[in-house]
């Protein structure tokens, strides 16, 4: 449960050096609380300021003060998923298990996040909405970047595809090999692999750690490492790749 012991505070220095920030694949689930702390928002427990708040501290925070808060960052933020912070199929429901959280952990954390958002909104009066799309990337960091700090959020997948002219290049190929650590329904929610699958018309093969989507017809065939991939990733990937090569040779 390391995700409950770290926060996003380290981002501040990096954000001051760039105009475009890519989000996704984070380990923390602090939805930007660490960053807000660095920007002057005080998270208080029993009258004492928590200097470097992490998710594990959330149950103890009873008030929020923004006397020295600096907001409105001029930053372009790219999100790797459309998933919302809270609500149905929230970021914690979808990505929490990948970050080591149990179902019980997730339910408790969602309640604490909702409570903290209420405290923050009471102090800042921003009419915050954690159910909006694109608010759940990077452990909910995009929620804070957009709705509290005023950053523009856009699809990272669409940005990447546009900048690389990748869709046009796909027209030159009859076979596509798509790789993902774990492919599930969330892979189709704004991620690059999902956007490419919408456009690619040829034979589509999955190669990766685990195929967990309910729809088994997304790919022509799929080759996965499975549970063994966690223990022996290199050998498992070699085996899966060799199986794929055999199929491609037959075709």
What do the PLM-derived regions correspond to, one by one?
Residues 1-23, 27-251:
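N-terminal loops that bind phosphate or other acidic moieties
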């Amino acid at each position: 449960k390391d995700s409950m012991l770290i926060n996003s505070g380290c981002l501040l220095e990096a954000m001051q050096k760039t105009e475009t920030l890519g989000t996704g694949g984070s380990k923390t689930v602090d939805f930007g609380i660490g960053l807000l702390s660095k920007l002057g928002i005080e998270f208080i427990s029993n009258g004492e300021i928590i200097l470097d708040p992490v998710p594990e501290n959330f149950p103890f925070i009873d008030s929020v003060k923004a006397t020295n808060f600096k907001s409105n960052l001029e930053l372009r933020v790219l999100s790797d998923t459309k998933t919302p912070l809270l609500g149905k199929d929230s970021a914690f429901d979808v990505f929490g298990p990948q970050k080591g959280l149990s179902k019980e952990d997730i339910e408790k954390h969602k309640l604490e996040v909702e409570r903290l958002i209420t405290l923050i909104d009471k102090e800042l009066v921003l009419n915050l909405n954690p159910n909006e799309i694109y608010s759940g990337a990077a452990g909910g960091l995009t929620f804070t970047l957009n709705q509290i700090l005023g950053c523009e959020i856009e699809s990272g997948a669409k940005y990447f595809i546009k900048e690389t002219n990748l869709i046009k290049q796909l027209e030159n190929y009859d076979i596509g090999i798509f790789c993902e650590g774990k492919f599930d329904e969330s892979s189709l929610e704004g991620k690059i692999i999902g956007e490419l699958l919408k456009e690619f018309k040829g034979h589509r093969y999955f190669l990766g750690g685990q195929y967990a989507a309910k729809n088994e017809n997304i790919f022509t065939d799929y080759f996965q490492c499975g549970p063994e991939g966690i223990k022996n990733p290199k050998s498992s990937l070699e085996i899966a790749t060799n199986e794929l090569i055999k199929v491609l040779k037959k075709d």
